[in-house]
Swiss-Prot record:
Keywords: Oxidoreductase
PROSITE patterns, per database record: ALDOKETO_REDUCTASE_1, ALDOKETO_REDUCTASE_2, ALDOKETO_REDUCTASE_3
Job description of the protein: Aldo-keto reductase involved in the biosynthesis of limonoids triterpene natural products such as limonin, a compound with insecticidal activity responsible for the bitter taste in citrus. Can use (1S)-1,7-diacetoxy-luvungin A as substrate.
Name of the protein this chain belongs to: (1S)-1,7-diacetoxy-luvungin A aldo-keto reductase
């Protein structure tokens, strides 16, 4: 019997989001990816997070189909699948086809959550590494209107955003008929996002955290979480790992968290966060940790805009 992961309702929708999700971004993809997804389901994971820009959509879909065939889950309704609109499709006329392509790749009829991956657009022909001349401003009103249509058509149960600041959410909400159900952003003890969390709470937007351990191994990740002395001391005192303390801290802030590991032992450890808690004193110590934003998104800077500086990308939230 796997771990029962708590869930939280998303706004006024009928969907509830599991408060711990399984991240699938990896370059190159782990050879044992599909087997690890099946193992994750056995452990109790039900929320799987992917994106059009990740190489994991197709193998994730294959693994989910296998899980259903094996009876590891009784029905598609037991799963919560998130994917994200890529920047080359962040235009009027490309959003719905972009989601339809994602659904075909995953082999699914609908998503539970579809996110705008980042508030910027790239020309449809753009490839990595991003060239400054390929960057375009994000059409808040036009793209979001098509995201709303995706939900109305039943292609996704809910819609949301990722990497949006308070200012960018304010701009989106000014014209949105359906407000974003979720804002998925970087958050961990080293980057606590207090201002943005308060804003999302005030607006009824569920806050979801990626990179709870600092995204070690990515091109922008860091080891500041795993090497932090405050977290190490708390972990030692509690007989837990630093990773467990960091994930528990995020969970204890009342937000959902996307964890990622293909190591079977750590996959299990990442779920061992529900039957213990951090004390008020420990929370206070963590709150005083010096802050550092890992994901700065410098790839989207251009002398011609829309973002000329990192400060402009994050509206000073750095």
């Amino acid at each position: 019997m796997g771990t029962a992961i708590p869930e939280e309702p998303l706004g006024s929708t009928e969907k509830s989001i599991p408060l711990v999700g399984f991240g699938t971004v990896e370059y190159p993809l782990n050879e044992a990816f599909k087997e690890r997804v099946l193992h994750a389901i056995k452990l109790g994971y039900r929320h799987f997070d992917t994106a059009a820009s990740y190489p994991s959509e197709q193998p994730l879909g294959e693994a989910l189909a296998e899980a259903l065939r094996l009876g590891l889950v009784k029905s598609r309704d037991e799963l919560f699948i998130t994917s994200k609109l890529w920047l080359t499709d962040s235009y009027c006329g490309r959003v719905i086809p972009g989601l339809q392509k994602t659904l075909k790749t995953l082999g699914l009829e609908y998503l539970d959550l579809y996110l705008v991956h980042f508030p910027v657009s790239l020309i449809p022909e753009a490839t990595y590494p991003v060239k400054p001349e390929d960057i375009r401003p994000f059409d808040y009103e036009g793209v979001w209107e098509e995201m709303e249509k995706c939900q109305e058509l039943g292609l996704t149960k809910t819609i949301g955003v990722s990497n949006f600041t308070c200012k960018k959410l304010e701009r989106l909400l000014a014209t949105a008929k359906i407000p974003p159900a979720v804002n998925q952003v970087e958050m961990n003890p080293i980057w606590q996002q207090k201002k943005l969390r308060e804003y999302c709470k005030e607006k009824g937007i569920h806050f979801s955290a990626f990179s709870p351990l600092g995204a070690v191994g990515t091109n922008w990740g860091h080891n500041r979480v795993m090497e932090n002395e405050v977290l190490k001391q708390i972990a030692k005192a509690k007989g837990k790992t630093v990773a467990q303390v960091a994930i528990r801290w995020v969970y204890q802030q009342g937000v959902s968290v996307i964890v990622k590991s293909f190591n079977k032992e750590r996959m299990e450890q990442n779920l061992d966060i529900f039957d213990w808690e951090l004390s008020a004193e420990e929370l206070q110590k963590i709150e005083q940790i010096p802050q550092y934003r890992g994901s700065r998104a410098e790839a989207y800077l251009s002398e011609n805009g829309p973002f000329r500086t990192v400060e402009e990308i994050w509206d000073g939230e750095i």
